[in-house]
From Swiss-Prot:
The protein, known as: Probable chemoreceptor glutamine deamidase CheD
UniProt cross-references to NCBIfam families, sorted A to Z: PRK13487.1 (NF010013)
Source organism superkingdom: Bacteria
The reaction(s) this protein catalyses: L-glutaminyl-[protein] + H2O = L-glutamyl-[protein] + NH4(+)
InterPro entries to which the protein is assigned, alphabetical: CheD-like_sf, Chemorcpt_Glu_NH3ase_CheD, Cytotoxic_necrot_fac-like_cat
GO MF annotations in UniProt: protein-glutamine glutaminase activity
Similarity comment: family membership: Belongs to the CheD family.
PANTHER family assigned to the protein according to its UniProt record, in alphabetical order: CHEMORECEPTOR GLUTAMINE DEAMIDASE CHED-RELATED (PTHR35147:SF2)
Pfam families (alphabetical): CheD (PF03975)
Function according to Swiss-Prot or TrEMBL: Probably deamidates glutamine residues to glutamate on methyl-accepting chemotaxis receptors (MCPs), playing an important role in chemotaxis.
């Protein structure tokens, strides 16, 4: 059974490429599934972590915009630190074992103009690597940084990931979408909480 536990509903559609139902995650969203749903997202400087318990065959994906933020700084799910906790905790609630969780991480492209000295994409990529290392969750595959936006499909039951690097023509569109979400979220009130599991 697939359920979105975030306030915003995740859009589902029939993916003709893979002949399955796909759930499209937007920035700040995450989803955990235990069926054949393809989790998909489009990434520029944002990062998506795909986590999986290979024994239980459940997994999830998140999509975050920035590594860390301050409490009271708008929607907390835009920050990797919060988005990672939500994803891990949801998997643990569904029976995943922390020691079996493995990760595949994607995104962190440097597509936002004006961030040349400390690019958001690079910071996001560094954050997700450091976070997973600190949590003792191995990264078994990654496609991070670079200059190209990506579209990612993750199949939790098998662990398969398909990454399509998008041509330069998509950079402006992806960057504009990410910037618009950042602007909207900077005005959003803080909601929700995190329950930590040891």
């Amino acid at each position: 059974m697939s359920t979105a536990v975030q306030v915003d509903d995740v859009m589902r559609y029939r993916d003709s490429r893979f002949q399955t139902i796909a759930a499209k995650l937007l920035p700040t969203q995450y989803l955990v599934v235990d069926d054949d749903t393809a989790l998909t997202t489009t990434l520029g400087s944002c990062v998506a972590a795909c986590l999986r318990d290979p024994v239980l065959k459940i997994g999830g994906m998140n999509h975050f915009l920035l590594p860390k933020g301050q409490v009271g700084d708008g929607a907390p799910t835009r920050y990797g630190s919060y988005a990672m906790e939500l994803l891990i905790n949801d998997m643990l609630k569904r029976g995943a074992h922390r020691k079996r969780i493995e990760a595949k991480v994607f995104g962190g492209a440097n597509v936002l103009k004006g961030f040349t000295s400390n690019p958001v994409g690079t910071r996001n990529a560094e954050f997700v690597r450091q976070y997973l290392q600190a949590e003792h969750i191995p990264i078994i595959a990654e496609d991070l940084c670079g200059i190209h936006p990506r579209k990612v499909w993750f199949f939790a039951t098998t662990g398969r990931v398909v990454v399509q690097r998008l041509p330069h023509a998509h950079e402006a569109e992806v960057a504009a979408t990410e910037s618009a979400v950042r602007a909207r979220l900077s005005k959003a009130p803080v909601t929700g909480g995190v329950e930590l599991f040891e």
